[in-house]
């Protein structure tokens, strides 16, 4: 990666020159939209980090304006900054309404559209503020003692629901006040760590009165309970919902702690009555995940996402509705044999929009509840849609692909026969960067697997691809293990930056991925070293038949389950590959079973504990642990891991690296003391990309060195 190919004109820093009052720091240097200049029309790590990333999207009550947030990153400052924008719903008159160094997020229209509420940390903690739609007249609405992490005003505007952390675990200092400098942590049950934190608090939903200027009478809906709502690590305000009458709150909660929490996905939807303070569990009979409730606009129904089986986090995510008068429940997405990833009621309460993945694309669908739950696909094309908001006769959604990050689109909410709904792009946040880049072609290929099935494989070609040349080629191994290889855009595992470095990328939707029916999705559980690995070999072997693929310069890369795949393939690839890269991968399955914090996942996907000698599924899983095949390792390998990763501990990468070195296999180890399962800090991200390509180039482009 040559630094001379890219010039930072301002390193993602800009002098403020935007609308709105912007707070006290309006005239200081800010992290904002980059004016990066790129030479050579090839994607670079710096170009990726220069891109603005669109976040929350909200439509005004009169459906004339859209408010949204954008995160900007500075590599020199090694941090980000969130700003807010407002535009007309046709995309015109787009203007930035905040311009400061505070973190502003979650724009929400309140007071019939006269004001925008937002989260802002200007006073040192994250509080709720309001301002005019042009950014003027900023005013702080809450002075809560602690950070507010999400919020929602009641439909009548008289109450506020917000999320904040409460202490659930006594610290060592609490137990031993005479030892204030002691650093030891005393643990008595499981779930003491989760994702990337030592668990000492839980998010709780709070409700307060709101008089238009201040909040009062704050009440913790889970007062005295050690449970979390929303659920860690990723749950937000979408896991709670107001009733249209403003007198009830539906919330998602798994009312378990310790070992019971660690082995179960059994969350439920609870309805809290503000008048009686009573709570009702409406999903008690279901044993899997129940999440993300939404009341219908007419208040007659409530909808939510539901998985059937306890402990199976990748179970079919179904859409259910319940008649609030009769209690009757209905599985309304039955005709869609894939996951409902997000949903939204139509204003007439007669249909529901949702997004879901099918055949490697995440599209928008509609379920007509008044017509026997008839399913209609509204959008088409090589894209992934994300997030949904209604705007008159249109749906406002974010959309991305393997060739472009998120932008906001307006989609007609009707389909005319075989003609899919029209989508109009409303934002062009990174057009100034895309205009300087040439993207590689993305192609869909269907390949016949060893068991006679058809597998969708994405192939991404270098820009200015020449079929008369031979290219080094990378097999991409997806994580999850049940995450789709759809039209995703990543700021780390970005296929276009791999293609820009003159690699062909082969990305198969191997066994275990959603979007191809339940049977295909479930085929990986208990079979980590089985058909999914044969699918990988099918993909790379089929592509190796092409004259433009240099089968003597094949690499294999992946993260999480993809990292496990790399470690496993390193002992089974029969000299196909010349270089491996494993990020946050599982090397020793027995240790992973004990080390990972969400035990339900290990129990389900591994089939059980390794000490269950009569459990054939579990024994097959652990017999396929990559560490058992190190004696067959003969190919250079780069191991990457974050030490704050509590899903798969960093000692897995260290052990793999040590084993390779002791075996005499060329190896390199990249460890991040301050990153989790992902790499989130700008300079760490740049280092990741540079190390990634330096390693691949060393072994797959030796003639060029």
Protein language model features and the residues they cover:
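Conserved beta-propeller blade repeats
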Residues: 51-66, 101-117, 138, 145-160, ...
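Active-site-proximal cap/loop segments of hydrolase catalytic domains
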Residues: 494, 499, 507-705
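Short, solvent-exposed loop/turn segments at conserved positions within beta-propeller repeat blades
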Residues: 76-81, 121-126, 197-201, 260-267, ...
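Beta-strand-rich domains and repeat architectures in extracellular enzymes and scaffolds
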Residues: 46-82
């Amino acid at each position: 990666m040559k630094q001379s190919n890219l010039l930072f004109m301002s390193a993602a820093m800009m002098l403020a020159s935007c609308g709105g009052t912007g707070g006290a720091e309006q005239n200081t240097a800010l992290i904002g939209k980059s004016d990066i200049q790129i030479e050579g029309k090839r994607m670079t790590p710096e170009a990726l980090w220069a891109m603005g990333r669109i976040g929350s999207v909200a439509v005004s009550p009169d459906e004339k304006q859209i408010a949204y947030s954008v995160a900007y990153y500075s590599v020199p400052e090694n941090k980000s900054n969130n700003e807010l924008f407002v535009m007309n719903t046709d995309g015109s008159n787009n203007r930035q309404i905040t311009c400061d160094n505070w973190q502003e997020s979650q724009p929400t229209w309140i007071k019939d559209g006269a004001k925008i509420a937002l989260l802002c940390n200007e006073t040192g903690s994250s509080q709720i503020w309001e301002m005019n739609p042009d950014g003027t007249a900023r005013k702080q609405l809450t002075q809560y003692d602690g950070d507010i992490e999400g919020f929602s005003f009641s439909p009548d505007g008289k109450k506020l629901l917000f999320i904040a952390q409460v202490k659930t675990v006594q610290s060592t200092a609490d137990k031993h006040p005479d030892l204030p400098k002691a650093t030891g942590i005393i643990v008595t049950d499981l779930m003491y760590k989760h994702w990337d934190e030592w668990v000492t608090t839980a998010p709780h939903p709070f409700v307060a009165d709101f008089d238009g200027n201040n909040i009062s009478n704050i009440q913790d809906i889970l007062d005295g309970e050690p449970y979390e709502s929303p659920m860690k690590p990723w749950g937000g305000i979408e896991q709670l919902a107001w009733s249209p009458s403003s007198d009830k709150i539906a919330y998602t909660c798994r009312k378990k702690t310790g070992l019971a929490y660690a082995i179960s996905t059994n969350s439920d939807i609870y309805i809290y009555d503000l008048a009686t303070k009573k709570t009702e569990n409406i999903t008690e009979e279901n044993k899997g995940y129940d999440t993300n409730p939404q009341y219908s606009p007419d208040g007659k129904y409530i909808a939510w996402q539901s998985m059937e089986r306890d402990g199976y986090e990748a179970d079919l995510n179904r859409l259910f509705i319940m008649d609030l008068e009769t209690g009757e429940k209905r599985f309304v997405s039955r005709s869609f044999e894939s996951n409902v990833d997000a949903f939204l009621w139509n204003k007439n309460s007669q249909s529901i929009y949702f997004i879901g993945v099918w055949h490697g694309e995440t599209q928008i669908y509609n379920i007509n509840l008044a017509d026997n739950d008839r399913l209609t696909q509204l959008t088409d094309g090589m894209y992934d849609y994300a997030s949904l908001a209604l705007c008159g006769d249109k749906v406002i959604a974010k959309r991305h692909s393997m060739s472009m990050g998120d932008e906001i689109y307006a989609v007609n909410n009707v389909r005319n026969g075989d003609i899919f709904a029209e989508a109009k792009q409303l934002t062009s946040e990174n057009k100034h960067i895309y205009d300087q880049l040439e993207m590689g072609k993305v192609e869909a290929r269907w390949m016949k697997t060893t068991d006679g099935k058809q597998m969708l494989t994405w192939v991404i070609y270098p820009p200015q691809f020449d079929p008369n040349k031979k290219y080094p080629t990378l097999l991409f191994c997806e994580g999850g293990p049940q995450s789709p290889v759809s039209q995703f855009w990543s700021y780390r595992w970005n296929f276009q930056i791999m293609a820009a470095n003159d690699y062909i990328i082969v990305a198969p939707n191997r066994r275990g991925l959603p979007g191809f029916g339940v049977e295909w999705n479930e085929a990986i559980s208990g079979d980590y070293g089985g058909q999914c690995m044969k699918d990988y070999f099918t993909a790379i072997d089929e592509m190796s038949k092409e004259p433009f693929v240099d089968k003597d310069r094949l690499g294999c890369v992946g993260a999480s389950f993809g990292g496990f795949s790399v470690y496993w393939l390193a002992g089974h690839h029969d000299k196909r590959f010349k270089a491996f890269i494993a990020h946050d991968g599982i090397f020793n399955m027995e240790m992973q079973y004990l080390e990972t914090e969400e035990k339900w996942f290990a129990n389900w996907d591994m089939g059980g504990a390794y000490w269950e000698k009569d459990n054939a599924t579990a024994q097959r899983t652990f017999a396929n642990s990559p560490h058992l095949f190190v004696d067959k390792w003969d190919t250079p390998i780069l191991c990457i891991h974050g030490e704050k990763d509590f899903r798969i501990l960093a000692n897995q990468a260290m052990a793999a690296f040590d084993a390779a070195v002791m075996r005499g296999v060329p190896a390199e180890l990249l460890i991040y003391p301050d990153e989790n399962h992902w790499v989130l800090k700008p300079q760490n991200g740049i280092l990741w990309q540079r190390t990634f390509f330096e390693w691949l180039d060393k072994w797959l482009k030796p003639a060029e060195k």
